[in-house]
Amino acid sequence: TVLSYVNALKKIFVVEESPAWNPNLRSKTAIRTSDTRYFIDPSIAVASLGIGPKDLINDLNTFGLLFETLCIRDLRVYAESIKGKVYHYRDANDLECDAVIHLRDGSYGLIEIKLGGDSLINEGADTLKKLESRIDITKMKNPSFLLVLTATGKYAYRREDGVYVVPI
């Protein structure tokens, strides 16, 4: 079965699951609680597909998915060093957040991962602000930060709306 293959891949550290984040929200929208699977090393996916840099440049959707996997891997390493965990969020209305870093003290940050470019960065920031507006701050803290993680740019900066844009 597919599940036995997934379990085998987890045992040999090819894939890893990212659990769903379940915050207190003001809306009654159902939150999807299934795990998301990522390659531990996105180069495994590239090698198994038999593709190279030119192929990825010509297929930005695949490139974006692999970039997201790379970023999730790095975010997990950073989060583990401060005893945090990385989650993902998606609700029934398809509002999603690529990564939520959550610390034991209840603080957390919301992260959207985008290849770059103003329109994608704006889209990521809008998504983060929308999710932030739905969090019930009477039951949990405000997010410590909102961040769009990108593949482009020389410097990190803070936008006027408070969202950080950080190149990996």
Mark where each language-model region is:
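Mg2+/Mn2+-dependent nuclease catalytic core
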Residues: G116-I137
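Short helix-terminating capping/connector loops at secondary-structure junctions
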Residues: I82, T138-P143
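Switch/connector loops and helix/strand junctions flanking conserved nucleotide-binding motifs
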Residues: A47, L120-N122, Y155-E160
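Domain-level recognition of nuclease-like catalytic cores that cleave nucleotide substrates
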Residues: A151-I168
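Accessory nucleic acid-recognition modules appended to NTPase machines
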Residues: T1-S107
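Short beta-strand/turn micro-motifs composed of small residues
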Residues: R90, V148-T150
